[in-house]
Design a protein with these regions (language model features):
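Conserved beta/loop motifs at nucleotide-recognition and modification sites
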Residues: 1-161
Length: 161
């Protein structure tokens, strides 16, 4: 739906949740409103890059609580690393934020955030992470791993570096 429809839906949920009370708290909103999944994914990659395994796992469990399928989370995580790989490759070629945004199909602000995040990784690391993500996806499809375990393994392994 549209943003206004989403806002209206979220407001309705908050009103129903706090029905018996006169005031709505931030905790009420946090308890019922859908958080932006892409923000969680970006924060997870940040936590992984910083070696903060617990924070990355906490964010993953929050996404699961929001009924986000594990395979979608894995796809989005690998996609974020792919974006970082592309952004870092362009930056290494001497391109600036605006050119990177244009070439990578990103908003300039988003390109800037990705450029900062990409600095925390080496090109080889990013390539390896993408390959490992693809392998885990294959392991789930062939029944070697459950989807949930695959994502947990991905987060744990990447945050140990």
């Amino acid at each position: 739906g549209t943003d206004m429809e989403n806002i209206q839906g979220e407001l309705e949920k908050v009103f129903c949740y706090a029905l018996e009370r006169d005031t709505i708290t931030k905790e009420d909103i946090d308890a019922v409103c859908v958080t932006q999944i892409t923000n969680h994914i970006f924060e997870m990659v940040d936590a992984v890059a910083a070696g903060n395994q617990q924070k990355a796992l906490d964010l993953y469990y929050e996404l699961l609580a929001l009924k986000e399928p594990p395979m979608r989370i894995l796809f989005l995580l690998v996609r974020q690393y792919r974006i970082l790989f592309h952004v870092k490759a362009l930056a290494n070629q001497g391109y600036g934020r605006k050119e990177i945004a244009s070439k990578a199909g990103l908003h300039p602000f988003v390109a800037g955030k990705n450029m900062e995040q990409a600095k925390r990784f080496k090109m080889g690391q990013l390539r390896r992470v993408m390959e490992e993500g693809a392998q885990l996806e294959q392991d789930v499809k062939t029944g070697l791993l459950t989807d949930n375990l695959a994502v947990e393994l991905f987060i744990v392994k990447q945050s140990e570096r």
